[in-house]
């Protein structure tokens, strides 16, 4: 990860960056900065109503967004139990979480992601990351840093590291019902 410090600096400056996740590269930014999130939505041509996924290596970085009062110890156990596949959990959002993150919902999609690149980025920035697949509309998600540069240009900030090699994107499930919104 030769350019880790540069990517950390870009995130701290509220820029959108590309970084590896479990299966594909993600586009991410500081979820606490509205202009950064709006730049991400514009880049992806993604409607705000859809909401975004937040990822972090620890529950603590995701707690500012989750309404803990609506969850039991059993829900937390489900959330924190390691799985072979990446699972994004739809959880109740705190009322203060902005609509540009939740979209049209009163929930927030969150995932514990413990691959080295995400751990390094979150530890060095001190915040969770937004995560949406790194691709332009109509194109396949990028699986390498080189593919990111081909789609977004040679100057686009991309962390030079590898994905965890998973085949499919994360599964998306409801924390209360276990309903699967997207198969992983």
Curated annotation (Swiss-Prot):
GO MF term set: ATP binding; double-stranded RNA binding; L-threonylcarbamoyladenylate synthase; tRNA binding
Annotated InterPro entries: DHBP_synth_RibB-like_a/b_dom, Sua5-like_dom, TC-AMP_synthase, TC-AMP_synthase_SUA5
Any Pfam family matching the protein: Sua5_yciO_yrdC
Catalysed reaction equations from the record: L-threonine + hydrogencarbonate + ATP = L-threonylcarbamoyladenylate + diphosphate + H2O
Keywords associated with the record: ATP-binding, Cytoplasm, Nucleotide-binding, Nucleotidyltransferase, Transferase, tRNA processing
Enzyme class name: transferase
GO biological process: regulation of translational fidelity; tRNA threonylcarbamoyladenosine modification
A cellular-component GO term for this protein: cytoplasm
Assigned EC number: 2.7.7.87
Gene3D superfamilies per the UniProt record, alphabetical: DHBP synthase (3.90.870.10)
Cell compartment(s), UniProt: Cytoplasm
Keyword Cytoplasm included in the entry's annotation: yes
Residues of the YrdC-like domain: 1-184
Keyword Lipoprotein applies: no
Function field: Required for the formation of a threonylcarbamoyl group on adenosine at position 37 (t(6)A37) in tRNAs that read codons beginning with adenine. Catalyzes the conversion of L-threonine, HCO(3)(-)/CO(2) and ATP to give threonylcarbamoyl-AMP (TC-AMP) as the acyladenylate intermediate, with the release of diphosphate.
PANTHER family documented for this protein: SUA5, THREONYLCARBAMOYL-AMP SYNTHASE
Family in the record: Belongs to the SUA5 family. TsaC subfamily.
Protein name, UniProt field: Threonylcarbamoyl-AMP synthase
Species the sequence originates in: Actinobacillus pleuropneumoniae serotype 3 (strain JL03)
Lineage: Bacteria, Pseudomonadati, Pseudomonadota, Gammaproteobacteria, Pasteurellales
């Amino acid at each position: 990860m030769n350019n880790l410090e540069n990517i950390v600096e870009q995130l701290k400056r509220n820029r959108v960056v590309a970084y590896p996740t479990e299966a594909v590269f993600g586009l991410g930014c500081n979820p606490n900065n509205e202009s950064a999130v709006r730049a991400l939505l514009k880049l992806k041509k993604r409607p705000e109503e859809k909401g975004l996924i937040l990822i972090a290596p620890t529950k603590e970085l995701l707690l500012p967004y989750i309404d803990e009062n609506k969850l039991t110890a059993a829900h937390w156990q489900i959330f924190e139990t390691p799985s072979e596949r990446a699972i994004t959990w739809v959880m109740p959002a705190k009322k203060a979480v902005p609509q540009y993150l939740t979209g049209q919902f009163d929930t927030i999609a969150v995932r514990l992601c413990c691959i080295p690149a995400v751990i390094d980025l979150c530890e060095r920035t001190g915040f969770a990351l937004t995560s949406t697949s790194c691709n332009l509309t109509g194109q396949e998600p990028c699986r390498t840093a080189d593919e990111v540069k081909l789609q977004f240009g040679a100057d686009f900030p991309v962390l030079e590291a590898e994905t965890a090699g998973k085949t499919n994107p994360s599964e998306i499930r409801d924390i209360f019902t276990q309903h699967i919104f997207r198969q992983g």
